[in-house]
């Protein structure tokens, strides 16, 4: 029993997350760094109201990552938000303090910003963000911060967004960054792609897909076929995961 109590438990909450990057990443890192008392598990929730059941059943929890579709709906279950999480209105990392308080953070924006910096010597001027869910919030935050104009594309656009059917040749030509924040194209539905006019794309465009499985989505393949630069979400995930660990452990990132 004492051995069990010493375990430091971490994990991921989301829906249909067997494919997840996080469990494999952290399990390998724990092993590499000889953190034998640390364990990372997946918690697949049918609905966000199951969150408290997970907490009550796992008193050893020290931290959680949060993925689709709960990055926004998790917020009412938390005691406090970091400034960034509050501004972004989405949480992807939870820290469990010794007092029992649950603090929500957003490390997605750091991951996206760092991955984007690697692709641009100077900032992009105009962008399209495909999707308006929780994953898009960190992207919006970064683009606002660096002064990049953008339009949000949604299947059900509000007054501040546009629909996919409204993406014209003119809009594409004014854009040099297109970010897919939707799950369209994720394994196993790898033949699907966001409905944009790919024939207007060229070498002036960077296509950034937050999806990392498959490595090259149909969205990226179509962009590549038209001469675009492309990148998937792996580096963003790696950078945000390292930041999550620094929050949980209050130590520098993994070696």
Language-model segments: residues:
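Glycine-rich adenosine-cofactor-binding loop
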Residues: 14, 106-109, 116, 120, ...
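Active-site capping/gating segments
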Residues: 114-115, 228-251, 255
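Rossmann-like adenosine-cofactor binding region
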Residues: 160-231, 235
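Short glycine-rich anion-binding loops that position phosphate/pyrophosphate groups of nucleotides
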Residues: 66-73, 134-135, 183-186, 213
């Amino acid at each position: 029993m004492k051995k069990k109590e010493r375990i430091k438990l971490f994990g991921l909450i989301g829906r249909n997350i067997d494919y997840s990057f996080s469990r494999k990443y952290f399990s390998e890192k724990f092993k590499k760094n000889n953190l034998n008392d640390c364990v990372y598990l997946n918690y697949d929730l049918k609905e966000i109201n199951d969150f408290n059941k997970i907490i009550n059943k796992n008193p050893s929890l020290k931290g959680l990552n949060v993925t689709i579709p709960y990055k926004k709906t998790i917020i009412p279950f938390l005691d406090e938000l970091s400034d960034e999480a509050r501004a972004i209105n989405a949480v992807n990392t939870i820290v469990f303090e010794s007092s029992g308080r649950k603090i929500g953070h957003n490390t997605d924006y750091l991951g996206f910003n760092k991955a984007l910096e690697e692709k641009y010597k100077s900032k992009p001027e105009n962008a399209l963000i495909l999707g308006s869910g929780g994953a898009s919030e960190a992207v919006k935050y970064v683009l606002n911060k660096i002064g990049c104009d953008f339009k949000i594309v949604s299947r059900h656009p509000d007054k501040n967004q546009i629909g996919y059917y409204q993406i014209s040749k003119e809009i594409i030509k004014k854009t040099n960054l297109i970010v897919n924040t939707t799950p369209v194209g994720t394994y196993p539905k790898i033949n699907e792609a966001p409905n944009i006019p790919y024939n207007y794309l060229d070498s002036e465009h960077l296509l950034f897909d937050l999806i990392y499985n498959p490595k090259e989505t149909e969205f990226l393949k179509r962009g590549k076929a038209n001469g675009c630069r492309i990148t998937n979400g792996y580096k963003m995930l790696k950078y945000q995961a390292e930041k999550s660990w620094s929050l949980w452990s209050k130590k520098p990132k993994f070696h």
